[in-house]
A protein has these predicted regions:
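Glycine-rich phosphate/adenosyl-contacting loop at the front of the ribokinase-like
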Residues: 1-51, 62-65, 300-310
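A glycine-rich helix N-cap at a beta->alpha junction
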Residues: 68-83
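Conserved phosphate-binding/catalytic region of the ribokinase-like
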Residues: 193-310
Length: 310
């Protein structure tokens, strides 16, 4: 929602102890989101048929149909009988200040999901990406992956601020991939009390997104890989860019291409998303994707990717 005035003008200095405000907004945009769904949507666009695991509300039917149409397996989404799907509601004023609320809703039921059931249904799991979710659910799914020997990626992002050091240590220890941005990278080290080197010794690969500078992939005793982003045609909305990178990167892993190539696919998809308002509003046209990918990363890289896009 957009408020044409300034929030600051609506507050009375000596009445801040009893605030009661209502804003007449100009427009209402309802957009699909959620980190898991955003990543799955992107992977579906790339043809990898990801399995979305999470908890949604009894209002999920329309969203499920959308994801199904875009190549996402939604059969393992738990549906709450009593709660709505989690959502973020935000109003932005003329100065781009925001007032927002996040409703967790059915997300709290993610802790009730057992990954073994999912694995049995599909004949095994190659990699489980554990993203920002119900904290108890994240811990349960991490422990289940560890106990069952299922490779997993740790990607706590927005939940880092809420979790304590011990919880974060549990979530990342033994991960095949650890995802974060630069700020989160430092916060992880501060909260866990582990140095960068100590964390690298506990995970397979540390994947750090660097904004417009691309991504860095590190591994203990191995070569550091840095990949830049393709040039943007325009910058419309940064929301969901990190999810798009993960979608491209994870798709590359599913294809079996080298890490550098997977990161390039992630950066290309992230660039398409930043050029579009909304996290799932972009269309991946294969010819256009490959044309820009080739321009950014060269013919050899493009040949390795083209065969997987069809």
């Amino acid at each position: 929602m957009t408020f044409p005035g300034r929030f600051a003008d609506q507050f009375v200095a000596d009445q801040l102890h009893t605030v009661s405000l209502s804003f007449l907004v100009d427009n209402l945009d309802v957009r699909r989101g959620g980190v898991g769904a955003n990543i799955a949507f992107g992977m579906g666009q790339l043809g990898t048929r990801p399995i979305l695991v999470g908890a949604a509300g009894f209002d999920f039917d329309e969203y499920r149909a959308w994801l199904d149409r875009h190549g996402v397996d939604t059969e393992s989404v738990r549906i709450s009988d009593t709660l709505h799907t989690a959502r973020f509601v935000c109003t932005t004023d003329a100065d781009h200040n925001q007032i927002g609320s996040f409703y967790t809703g059915a997300m709290s039921e993610a802790r009730l999901i057992e990954l073994k059931t999912v694995a049995d249904r599909v004949g095994g799991l190659d990699l489980v990406s554990i993203g920002a979710d119900d904290p108890e659910g994240m811990l349960r799914h991490t422990e289940e992956c560890r106990s069952r020997g299922i490779p997993f990626a740790a990607d706590f992002s927005q939940q880092i601020a809420r979790m304590n050091g011990e919880e974060i240590r549990i979530l990342l220890d033994g991960a095949t991939y650890l995802f974060s941005n630069e700020y989160e990278k430092g916060l992880i080290e501060t909260k866990t009390g582990w140095s960068d080197a100590e964390i690298l010794g506990r995970v397979g690969h540390r994947v750090t997104t660097l904004g417009a500078r691309g991504v860095r992939i590190e591994q203990a005793g191995g070569e550091t890989i840095e990949v830049g982003c393709p040039d943007e045609e325009r910058k419309a909305d940064p929301t969901g860019v990190g999810d798009a990178f993960r979608a491209g990167f994870l798709s590359g892993l599913a294809w079996g291409v080298p890490l550098e190539r997977a990161a390039q696919v992630g950066c290309m998809l992230a660039t398409l998303v930043i050029e579009t308002v909304g996290t799932q509003e972009y269309q991946l046209r294969r010819g256009h994707f490959m044309e820009r990918f080739t321009k950014a990363y060269g013919d050899e890289a493009a040949e390795e990717v083209r065969e997987h896009l069809g």
